[in-house]
Structure formats: structure tokens, C-alpha cells
Amino acid sequence: GKLDMRRNVQFGEGGAGTFSDGKLNTGTKNPRGQWVLSQFAAAGANPEILYDAKPHVGTDVLLTVVQVLRQRIIELGGEVRFGHQVTAVSLTQGRVTGLEVTHEADTYLLPCDRVILAIGHSARDTFETLLAQGVPMEPKPFSMGVRVEHPQALIDESQYGEAAKTGLLPPADYKLNVHLPDGTSAYTFCMCPGGQVVAAASEEGRVVTNGMSNAARDGKNANAAVVVTLQPEDFPDKSTLGGMYWQREIEAR
């Protein structure tokens, strides 16, 4: 279907993570992590995530889990407003006093003195608006690359050898990385056993891909992102949003 720039796999309930299948390993030892896993399990994820080394929910299950989590937030006094876009930040002497919000044809002011701006990397118009309003911002490193796909049977054989033929082992995954003397790193990311590659553009005329697996990970193919780290000094445009504009340029090629 035609891309809807307001409603796509980068935005909406659960955000881009909903369609990146719920890999819940962070690589940290924060004690809050186990509590987070318990909330996912209580919301319908497989309880095995509580002890798996690489907990995974699956896109098909996650679609329901995020709805349950939303209802839990509402029960605790939270409010969720779908289709309400923050179009500006109200500032007084450099301090936040509210948010300008647009819903359909109406615009209103939402008073507040604290904002957690969790907008991911695809709400580029919001970044531009904040910069134009004088909100302090600085460029940061990010990773960019491609997504590769190959038969899951190939990965199983590579990782398990003859044992892959028994049918007793789960779909195999892998992780590759290299660190060069100049500080550059290339590595695989978001490896999806038995998964699929999905279109993930959020702007017209651009090509972006993501990967996902359902809970069973029983697809015939595997995929992974192969990315390289980029520092602000690598960006052709040295402005605050230079990295973002470079992303946009590459996505349009």
C-alpha cells in the first residue's frame, strides 16, 4: 500500500520496536531489567524470557503485548493520545512550560514543566522544529548499513554442524564484529533467525529496511543488519543535524 507518513512501522503503538520483534537483551546488568521482563511476561510474552540468555518476544506476540501494557499504564493513571503530534515546545526564559499539540484540525497547548522526548530517529521534522526554536542540541554518533538475508538452514549448519539435521535445536543466530585501528567498528545487529526483512521507510521516496521474527522463528530465511559506526566528524555536513540529512540523502539514492 501507499506509505502513510503519520502511521507506519516507525510510529504508533510500541514504536519501531513493535516491528523489530522484541529482542529484550540490553547488554547491561541493571537490576531493573528483570522487572521489565516480568512486565512483558505478565502482559502475555512467553515466560521463558525471564531466564533466556537472549529473551525474545516475537512480532506476532508483541502486537498484543504492547496493547496490554498500554492498558496497564492507563490503569495506573497514565494517558495515551493517539494521533496527537507535538508541533512545538513552549519555552519561557529557556524553560519548558508546555507543548503545542496538533490533533486533526485543532491545536492546543499542553501545560508541563518536564518532557521526556522519546521520538526515536525518524521524526525528523520534530528535530528541525526544536533546533529552530533554540533547544540545545548536538550531533551524536550512529550506525548505518545494510540488511543481509540468507537461508536459515545455512546458518543452522554453520553454527550446529551435523547436529543441525536433528531438528532438536532452535534456529541458530550469529554475531560478527570487527574493530579497526582507527576506531571504526563494523558489526552485525538485530539478527533475526527464521525472520523476514520488512520495509521501514517513514518518508516518501526513500528506502529503509528492518528485520523481524515471529515468536516461533520458523521462517525459511534469516537476516541481520551489517552496520558501521559513524562519528560526527564523518558527516559531510558538519551542522547540528548534518547526520540526519546524510541519512535522508542515502535513503533516497
Can you say where each PLM-predicted feature lies in the sequence?
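Residues forming the flavin
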Residues: 1-253
